[in-house]
Curated annotation (Swiss-Prot):
Protein name per its UniProtKB record: Queuine tRNA-ribosyltransferase
PANTHER family given in the database record: QUEUINE TRNA-RIBOSYLTRANSFERASE CATALYTIC SUBUNIT 1
Active-site residues per Swiss-Prot or TrEMBL entry: D92 (proton acceptor), D265 (nucleophile)
Organism: Thermus thermophilus (strain ATCC BAA-163 / DSM 7039 / HB27)
Record family assignment: Belongs to the queuine tRNA-ribosyltransferase family.
Residues given in the record as substrate binding sites: D92, S93, G94, G95, F96, D146, Q188, G215
Quaternary assembly: Homodimer. Within each dimer, one monomer is responsible for RNA recognition and catalysis, while the other monomer binds to the replacement base PreQ1.
Cofactor: Zn(2+)
Keyword Magnesium: no
Amino acid sequence: MDPFRFQVEARAGRARVGRLFTPHGAVETPLFMPVGTAGSVKGLMPKDLEAIGSQVLLANTYHLLLRPGPERVRALGGLHGFAGWKGPWLTDSGGFQVMSLGHMRRIDEEGVVFQSHLDGRLIKLTPERSIAVQEALGADLIMAFDECPPYPSPREYLEASLERTLRWLERSLKAKTRPDQALFGIAQGGTDPELRRRSTLETIRFDLPGYAIGGLAVGEPKEAMFAMVELSTRLLPEDRPRYLMGVGHPEDLVAAMGLGVDLFDCVYPTRTGRFGSALVPEGRLNLKNARFLEDRRPLEEGCDCYTCQTFGRAYLAHLVRAGEMLGGILLSLHNLRHLHRLTEAARQAIREGRYGDFAREFARRRFGREVPPWFREALAAGGHW
């Protein structure tokens, strides 16, 4: 039997609950993946992540290629043996980090030559090299090498980029040798509907185990972003998981889940925590604010995370203002649990056929009377508003 299967178990409008089977266990979707950039989620141990309901972790190919190197990770048991997380892993292709972090020297048909942000050495990353690195790392879910254009980009560049990404997908697929890893293709096209449609349809032709919506959440307006998510989920096959890359704001998750997105990842919840802010249903609490210094309440009433069950806002505000490492750890733990509770509640609402009620209640608490048009339109397109 194929170690990778995806089955839809419940629907409400275009939202769906699914089960994704991998060699390291089955997971329920929609789900949010914490980002373990260098093989660890900053400040959190695997047992912490398991306790708060994390199901899949993401690691960055670019960072692990530079340090400690893929062959060392392979020799030490792959990510599952090396990093201590025994559940499923996903690795990205390295393309986005090359474009955003590396001092890129050249991009051509062969691949990308960039300068390491660590030591300045020149490194060449091609589709074949990206797949080889990801096979050495041993994640369950791996990504085809792609080019993520910045926003805004001229239409001519977007078109050339998406065509190159399709050719790189073909090369990624030919380079793949491990049957115990599932390769996802990434659709690009920016916010141009025609190019996004073309990229998505051409990517689907490869008949892959899953598909990613790439090139969004890079600075474009929310209206444009969700128009592309709506178009993409309408075109992508119903029987394969859909992954919206780099998206982690709660309101974005609620809108995208309503359109049928299954997988998400983002550094937002942990980075926000390290910067001293907590996610709550009304938005964010900036614990640097003096008004929290005598506030005994937990960050979020009803939250079952260790942070909320143990500490008040006053203590957390003290840690943040004192620059204590524990402050960022406790806030990161809460923020991830906040997103996991959100996806858990979404799955329950979908199973009970009331995703629209769930989304409207979320909007009432998050936005009050000023619900942004993009949010309403996305939910309406999913059959929930």
